Amino acid sequence: MAAIEDSPTFSSVVTPAAFEIGSLPTTEIPVDPVENDSTAPPKPVRITCPTVAGTYPVVLFFHGFYLRNYFYSDVLNHIASHGYILVAPQLCKLLPPGGQVEVDDAGSVINWASENLKAHLPTSVNANGKYTSLVGHSRGGKTAFAVALGHAATLDPSITFSALIGIDPVAGTNKYIRTDPHILTYKPESFELDIPVAVVGTGLGPKWNNVMPPCAPTDLNHEEFYKECKATKAHFVAADYGHMDMLDDDLPGFVGFMAGCMCKNGQRKKSEMRSFVGGIVVAFLKYSLWGEKAEIRLIVKDPSVSPAKLDPSPELEEASGIFV
């Protein structure tokens, strides 16, 4: 998506297809909490944004269980290159926080971004607070849903969201051991959301990895999240990929090692999965924020255009009816 000019016209810059890297160069800016700095975030954040002057929508990105925000560098740069400012907080340190604590921390970071993001952006790069979206992977996908559903006690109630995207969201290890807050109701279309929602899943997420249990178990993964959404909603499942296959290659440290071996992984190139995830996010944001329906509808109509094999067939249920 191109930059929003400071005028009634949103965009005039033509960008490549959503699955390709966009036309805008990007940069990554780590920002840490600093005592006595009113512009510092409440949690460490990693900002990924274009370096070209313009005003861009904001996307909050929440990492998965025990993961690091910099594990997603390739995907975040892909999205940012299409004209978005990504804010990825680091919500855990040595040990993951409780589920409700994580959701409340996410709300605090969103408040910070709405007020102080500009102080940390490159010169002439501005955030358009009118368009703020939520994206999350794994437990972070569940966090994004929880925030959108109003479970972040810290969130400024005046802040609204334009779109919600869960990437292989996970709500616990089984139906009896779920992370707080318990947002799944196991009732179809029970989520009270009035924004477009996309859910991305993986075919290998519900599979055991030798003796290791599934990272995205049945009844707590993308299938249930999608069932509980109302139109407008979309669903895409990368059949040959696992829960961690969207992460960068060669992840550092012990956490990176564990991220590479805990889950059932696919045998295909991870770069294809990253292009798929980045492309779905870009195409769905264009659909949700600007009403640009061509790319997302093309993916649904002709799944072969996706870098990753999609099975079952993708779905897009619009509020005015079903498009297949």
Swiss-Prot record:
User: What InterPro entries is this protein classified in?
Assistant: AB_hydrolase_fold (IPR029058), Chlorophyllase (IPR048264), Chlorophyllase-like (IPR017395)
| Catalyzed reactions | a chlorophyll + H2O = a chlorophyllide + phytol + H(+); chlorophyll a + H2O = phytol + chlorophyllide a + H(+)
What does the UniProt entry say about where the protein is found?
Cytoplasm, Cytosol
Q: Motif GXSXG: where?
A: 136-140
Q: What tissues is it present in? A: Expressed in seedlings, leaves, flowers and siliques, but not in roots.
Q: In which pathway does it act?
A: Porphyrin-containing compound metabolism; chlorophyll degradation
Q: List, from the UniProt record, the residues annotated as the active site of this protein.
A: S138, D168, H243
Q: What induces it?
A: Induced by methyl jasmonate, coronatine, a phytotoxin produced by some plant-pathogenic bacteria or rapidly after wounding, with a peak after 30 minutes and a return to the basal level in the following 4 hours. Induced by methyl jasmonate (JA), wounding, infection with the bacterial pathogen Pectobacterium carotovorum, and with the fungal pathogen Alternaria brassicicola. Induced by transition from dark to white light. Down-regulated by dark.
Q: A Gene Ontology biological process annotation?
A: chlorophyll catabolic process
The positions making up the signal sequence are none
What is the recorded function of this protein according to its Swiss-Prot or TrEMBL entry? Answer: Catalyzes the hydrolysis of ester bond in chlorophyll to yield chlorophyllide and phytol. Shows a preferential activity toward chlorophyll a. Does not seem to be required for chlorophyll degradation during senescence. May modulate the balance between different plant defense pathways.
Q: Additional info?
A: It has been proposed that some chlorophyllase might be transported to vacuole via the endoplasmic reticulum where they might be glycosylated. Unlike CLH2, the expression of this protein is dependent on the presence of a functional COI1 protein. Plants silencing CLH1 exhibit reduced size, and decreased levels of chlorophyll and chlorophyllide. Plants silencing CLH1 exhibit enhanced resistance and salicylate (SA) levels, and decreased jasmonate levels (JA) upon infection with the bacterial pathogen Pectobacterium carotovorum.
Tell me what this protein is called: Chlorophyllase-1
The species is Arabidopsis thaliana
Q: What is the lineage of its organism?
A: Eukaryota, Viridiplantae, Streptophyta, Embryophyta, Tracheophyta
